[in-house]
Curated annotation (Swiss-Prot):
InterPro entries tied to this protein: AA-permease/SLC12A_dom, Amino_acid_permease_CS, Amino_acid_permease_fungi, APC_YAT
Membrane-crossing residue ranges in chain numbering: 100-120, 123-143, 173-193, 205-225, 234-254, 282-302, 321-341, 369-389, 423-443, 447-467, 500-520, 530-550
Composition skew (Basic and acidic residues), residue ranges: 20-42
Extracellular topology ranges: 121-122, 194-204, 255-281, 342-368, 444-446, 521-529
Gene Ontology, cellular component aspect: cell periphery; endoplasmic reticulum; membrane; plasma membrane
Name of the molecule in the record: Valine/tyrosine/tryptophan amino-acid permease 1
Family, similarity comment: Belongs to the amino acid-polyamine-organocation (APC) superfamily. YAT (TC 2.A.3.10) family.
Function: High-affinity transport of valine and tyrosine. Low-affinity transport of tryptophan. Can also transport L-cysteine.
Topology relative to the membrane: Multi-pass membrane protein
Residue ranges that the UniProt entry lists as topological domain Cytoplasmic: 1-99, 144-172, 226-233, 303-320, 390-422, 468-499, 551-619
Length: 619
């Protein structure tokens, strides 16, 4: 059997399928850990001694284990159980509960909680909601496609950044990997700057102090590897989601006149100052900000190589994305638009330099006379910013590791320690994080805008590449006569959903180009500075793409469907046919029907089937 291919499931009944996989994975993990321990004893030449239980010896042992964890992973030839795995193994420490919370809350930070204030001022309330609505349709199609590929290539380091290289074109894969890696490397200082801006709501103390505190905090979290990241995100995202729920309830009460110092508000701000700020061009400014706000949701796939049971966790997380879109993004955005006028001087990007710029969530509550609560909201916004900084320090090193394994970066960066941490890549990310100490500069908001310029457009490129990869994957499966039963999870939006996502992404890029050459606030006149602030990622992508073409002298623009390698790196699922599943379900239903007291109702089994299908679809 080819080492690069993992046959995850054999012929089995539907009920035994996921259970047997989990049992085998758990037993193999135990066996592997035991074998590694034996090998370590053989290499050291020492006989295992009974462990002393006094506190001093325990402390010494813990310290030794901590320092030893930074050593390079044991080479594969010391353990036959590891020979079939990737060269650098990332620790499988992320559980299903972590992944569900990551899919719901990761990425809720700068874009939604802070950056929305700027685009509200340029687009108006109706423009902001319309832009987010279109972006939401695209995102759902993308995540469904990415979930299908994510389960097929769960063990691939770098995950979706390597899909284009395998399924579309190596040059496209290289360009997307480069720009996406740069995005996550710049997101870290962006969040540090945002943290300093958030703290200024309370105090005017030197911002670099807070940058240093947040920086050290996320470093400590990530020193615990993927487990530390996952547990921290579980806590952070729980706080964010609770804040969102609380904000929704409070915002409705305020709008109805039940809190604060004002009467019923209703849709007052949609009439005065109005629904749109700058017409259709204002709506176009929303698209990239919406993409940036939704960014980070794909991290659930990047962590696939470190998940204990991706067969269960990835489909569940992908299905729950719709709740994040509707409840966390769309609903909160609509409520903010009902409580904050787009001409408010307190919004980020306002022309009034004397205003105290704050998050639109804080403005929505504080401007209507509600006391204390804005401080809690601002505190959760700070937690959200720290959460995204934590995600960037998790994602950035793993993307660098993927580039190093592909030979794009020096091989020394492929160093992975015994706890599964890409250590040298981690240090490179820390260097980029130091940019965050410009928070004390007078040009703080300018730095924020430039860092956001790199991040926002990059998100569209990675999403488009994921959809293109899914399209080419389906084309190759059909062309080579492969069955879709080999796929563990099928995208609910199907083949054409990916085409819709690609078309929307292209539309966004065209709109962003229009806004870049004819900015809203420049009265349609070209401004080079504003152009690059809106379109900075495009030159990076083009340079990386054509540079790769020239260097490798590869002039084909895609891999033919019949030549796409569908075996290497892919998990192949062999599940029972649909006919067999139906037979099992029918037999079970028949027994339940005969033994049930309500067997007189012939529609009972049919209703149970319908309920089960609905549950599987939404949950």
């Amino acid at each position: 059997m080819d080492d690069s291919v993992s046959f995850i499931a054999k012929e089995a009944s539907p009920a035994q399928y996921s259970h047997s996989l989990h049992e085998r994975t758990h037993s193999e993990k135990q066996k592997r850990d035991f074998t590694i321990t034996e090998k370590q004893d053989e290499v050291s030449g020492q006989t295992a001694e009974p462990r002393r239980t006094d506190s001093k010896s325990i402390l010494q042992r813990k310290c030794k284990e901590f320092f030893d964890s930074f050593k390079r992973q044991l080479p594969p030839d010391r353990n036959s159980e590891l020979e079939s795995q990737e060269k650098n193994n990332l620790t499988k420490s992320i559980k299903s509960r972590h992944l569900v919370m990551i899919s719901l809350g990761t990425g809720i930070g700068t874009g939604l909680l802070v950056g929305n204030g700027q685009v509200l001022g340029t687009a108006g309330p109706a423009g902001l909601v319309l832009g987010y609505g279109i972006a939401s349709i695209m995102l759902y199609c993308i995540i469904q496609a990415a979930g299908e590929l994510g389960l097929c290539y769960a063990g691939l380091t770098g995950n979706y950044t390597r899909y284009p290289s395998i399924l579309v074109d190596p040059s496209l894969g290289f360009a997307v990997s480069v720009v996406y890696t740069i995005q996550w490397l710049t997101v870290l200082p962006l969040q540090l700057v945002t943290a300093a801006m958030t703290v200024k709501y309370w105090t005017s103390v030197n911002a670099d102090i807070f940058v240093a505190v947040v920086f050290v905090f996320v470093i400590i979290i990530n020193l615990f590897g993927s487990r530390g990241y996952a547990e921290a995100e579980f806590i952070f995202n729980s706080c964010k989601i609770l804040m969102v729920i609380g904000f929704v309830i409070l915002a409705i009460i305020i709008n109805c006149g039940g809190a604060g110092d004002r009467r019923y508000i209703g849709a007052e701000y949609w009439h005065n100052p109005g629904p749109f700020a700058h017409g259709f061009k204002g709506v176009c400014t929303v698209f990239c900000y919406a993409a940036f706000s939704y960014g980070g949701i794909e991290v659930l796939l990047l962590s696939a190589a470190e998940q204990e049971n991706p067969t269960k966790s990835i489909p569940n997380a992908c299905k729950k994305v719709v709740y994040r879109i509707l409840l966390i993004y769309m609903l909160t955005t609509i409520l903010v638009c009902f409580l904050v006028p787009y001409n408010s001087d307190e919004l980020l990007g306002s022309s009034d330099s004397s205003g105290s710029h704050a998050s639109p969530f804080v403005i929505a509550v504080a401007s209507h006379g509600v006391k204390v609560v804005p401080h809690f909201i601002n505190a959760v916004i700070l937690i959200s910013v720290i959460s995204v900084a934590n995600s960037s320090l998790y994602s950035g090193p793993r993307l660098l590791l993927s580039l190093a394994e592909q030979g794009v970066l020096p091989k020394c960066l492929a160093y992975v320690d015994r706890n599964g941490r890409p250590l040298l890549c981690f240090f490179v990310s820390l260097v980029f994080g130091c940019i965050g100490f410009v928070a004390t500069s007078d040009a703080e908001e300018q730095v924020f805008t430039w860092l956001l310029a790199i991040s926002s457009l990059s998100q569209l490129f990675i999403w488009m590449s994921m959809s293109l990869s899914h399209i080419r994957f389906r084309d190759a499966m059909a062309k080579q006569g492969r069955s879709m039963n080999e796929v563990g999870y099928k995208a609910q939006t199907g083949y054409w959903g990916s085409w819709l996502a690609v078309l929307i992404a292209i539309f966004f890029l065209v709109c962003q180009f229009w806004v870049a050459i004819a900015p809203v606030n420049e009265h349609g006149k070209l401004n080079v500075k504003v152009f690059f602030q809106n379109y900075l990622a495009m030159p990076i992508v083009l340079f990386a793409y054509f540079g790769h073409k020239i260097y490798f002298k590869s002039w084909s623009f895609w891999i033919p469907a019949e030549k796409i390698d569908l075996d290497s790196h892919r998990n192949i699922f062999v599940s029972p046919s649909l006919t067999e599943i139906d037979k099992v379900d029918d037999n079970d239903d028949l027994k339940e029907y005969e033994n049930s007291e309500s067997s007189e109702n012939p529609n009972s089994s049919r209703s149970r089937k319908f309920f089960k299908r609905m549950t599987n679809f939404w949950c």
